[in-house]
Amino acid sequence: MGNLQLYSVVITRDAEKKALLAPSHFNQPMVTEAPVVLTFCADFNRTTQWALNRKATPGYDNFLSFLNAATDALLYCQTFCNLAEAEGLGTCFLGTTIYQPQSIIDTLQLPRLVFPIATITLGYPDEDPAQCERLPLESIIHEETYTDYSAALIDCFYHEKENTPENKHFVEINNKETLAQVFTDLRYTKRDNEALSKTTLEALKQQGFL
C-alpha cells in the first residue's frame, strides 16, 4: 500500500529461542533443526511511529490496514523465497503461523500493530524432494467471470490428486472413504477452524487491528 513496506521480519537463529518458538508451530522438527527461522509480520507499528514523529495523525488500527499489511508481508515473503532459492538456499513454509499467533507474538515480543503472517525455515538443503502434486492450471483460471465447479469438473480436476499412491494410502490408513474426508474430518475440521478463528480474532484485537 502506497510503497509503505508494511512488513517486518524477525530472524531467529539462537537454539534456545527456536525451541521457544517450536510449540507455536506444533513442535514441527524443522523449527529447531533449520539454521534459521524467519517470521514475516504485518507491521503498521513502524509507519504509525513515523507518522507520530512527523506531526501526522495515523489511522491504521483497523481491519483494512491489517489486510493491506498482511498482503504486503506475504508478497515480501514469497519474493524472498524466490530470491533465496535462486541462490541455492532451501525454504519451507510453515502453515501454522496464524493458528497460534498470540504465542508467537509473546515469544517474539511483537508490539501493537504487528502481527505474524508467515514463517519459513531457511538453510542449504541436503536433499531434493519431488514436488507435491498440483491441481491442473485450468482448475484455477477463470476467464472474464468466475465459473463455478460442476461435479464433472471436480472429478476431472481432482482425479490425479486422488489417485496418487501416497494419497490413496493416506485414505486407507485413516479409514476414510475419500481423500476429501481426510481433510474435513481429520486434518482441518470445522471445530478446529472455529476454535482457531476465535483465538486469531482475539490476537488481532490484542494487537490493535480490530
Regions found by a protein language model. Give the residues of each.
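Acidic, surface-exposed loops and disordered segments
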Residues: 1-210
